[in-house]
């Protein structure tokens, strides 16, 4: 890799986004997940681990590209073997990585993740600090952000400065350029100093988003324990006046949707699950890919329901394989699953 790439200028890895009219730009963390070679064990019991690329915003960028859409990733990794590997993975998956930066002094973040015997995921993170937390405003590719039809982000970048301020600036640039702002909080409590800090920061940017995707667990957490299935709870505590779409993912059961005009539920697509990692990110990819092509579906309930069924199918396919990025589906795979479901 040349001097340019190491200094943080990734022009030699840039690919042409296939259609800047439908570009989805994802901002945030990309890291290495270490996953046990056997399932159903604690991290301490795992006999060995295999490495896999991770980080929700990066997963979404790959998911959009895998579906034939146009996507880019903005974030920071370490100037190390893992960081360069992640940049290459994006490039190989046709994601524009010209907004990636490398840090000389901090390492690429690592996460050890296991699915325990009781079905709960267990996380152990190494970020003290990691490169993704150190992205500076001066390192933002403002031109790339301004091209975004949709600007997508999470909450993990809000945990530490300077990345927190950088994310807020990036959101402002995108909003001023007319981008649709998409927010998936992707709650990871072990990363936050306290539950209170997580709740406060996640909600601090809530009213800026046009589209929000949350899980049932996140509703319970953000509302302080309220019933996640109660429409009144969602509408009174989490729906804000500027919001165009709020989606609640319900795993294998599908999703609920809320807009200014209508609300409803779209059932899940039944498959045999192997690994749920990345299912939510695949769902978001499917939804954002549809939105990038046609924003009018936010006002058309029939089209929105079709887009959400498509997103449900994206999530379903992803759980049938191990890992997030390797399992992200192609357009053909989603169409085949939907056809077989209908027949």
UniProtKB/Swiss-Prot annotation:
CC per GO annotation: cytosol
Catalytic activity: D-fructose + ATP = D-fructose 6-phosphate + ADP + H(+)
PROSITE patterns from the UniProt entry: PFKB_KINASES_1 (PS00583), PFKB_KINASES_2 (PS00584)
Keywords for this protein: Acetylation, ATP-binding, Carbohydrate metabolism, Kinase, Nucleotide-binding, Transferase
SUPFAM superfamilies in alphabetical order: Ribokinase-like
UniProt-listed Pfam families: PfkB
CDD domains associated with the record: bac_FRK
A biological process from GO: fatty acid biosynthetic process
GO molecular function, one term: ATP binding
The protein's Enzyme Commission number: 2.7.1.4
Record pathway: Glycan biosynthesis; starch biosynthesis
Residues the record lists as N-acetylglycine modifications: 2
InterPro entries noted in UniProt: Carboh/pur_kinase_PfkB_CS, PfkB_Carbo_kinase, PfkB_dom, Ribo/fructo_kinase, Ribokinase-like
Record bears the keyword Hydrolase: no
Function text: May play an important role in maintaining the flux of carbon towards starch formation.
Family: Belongs to the carbohydrate kinase PfkB family.
Protein name as it appears in the record: Probable fructokinase-7
Lineage of source species: Eukaryota, Viridiplantae, Streptophyta, Embryophyta, Tracheophyta
């Amino acid at each position: 890799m040349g001097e340019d790439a190491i200094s943080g200028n990734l022009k030699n890895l840039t690919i042409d986004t296939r259609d800047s009219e439908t570009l989805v730009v994802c901002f945030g963390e990309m890291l290495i997940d270490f996953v046990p070679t056997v399932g159903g064990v604690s991290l301490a019991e795992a006999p060995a681990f295999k490495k896999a690329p991770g980080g929700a915003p990066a997963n979404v960028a790959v998911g959009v590209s895998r579906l034939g859409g146009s996507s880019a990733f903005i974030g920071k990794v370490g100037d190390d073997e893992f960081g360069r590997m992640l940049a290459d993975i994006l490039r190989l998956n046709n994601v524009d990585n010209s907004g990636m930066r490398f840090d000389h002094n901090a390492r690429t973040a690592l996460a050890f993740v296991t699915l325990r015997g009781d079905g709960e995921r267990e996380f152990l993170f190494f970020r003290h600090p990691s490169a993704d937390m150190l992205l500076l405003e001066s390192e933002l590719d403002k031109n790339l952000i301004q091209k975004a039809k949709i600007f997508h982000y999470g909450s993990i970048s809000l945990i530490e400065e300077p990345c927190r301020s950088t994310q807020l600036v990036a959101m402002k640039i995108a909003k001023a350029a007319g981008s649709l702002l998409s927010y998936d909080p992707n709650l990871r409590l072990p990363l936050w100093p306290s539950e209170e800090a997580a709740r406060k920061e996640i909600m601090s940017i809530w009213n800026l988003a046009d589209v929000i995707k949350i899980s049932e667990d996140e509703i319970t957490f953000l509302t302080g324990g309220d019933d996640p299935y109660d429409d009144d709870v969602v509408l009174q505590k989490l729906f804000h006046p500027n919001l165009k779409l709020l989606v609640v993912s319900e795993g294998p059961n599908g999703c609920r949707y809320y807009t200014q005009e209508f609300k409803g539920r779209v059932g899940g697509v039944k498959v045999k699950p192997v690994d749920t990692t990345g299912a939510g990110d695949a769902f978001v990819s499917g939804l954002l890919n549809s939105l990038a092509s046609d924003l009018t579906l936010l006002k058309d309930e029939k089209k929105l329901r079709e887009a959400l069924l498509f997103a449900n199918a994206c999530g379903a396919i992803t759980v049938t394989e191990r890992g997030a990025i390797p399992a992200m589906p192609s357009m053909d795979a989603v169409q085949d699953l939907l056809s077989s479901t209908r027949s």
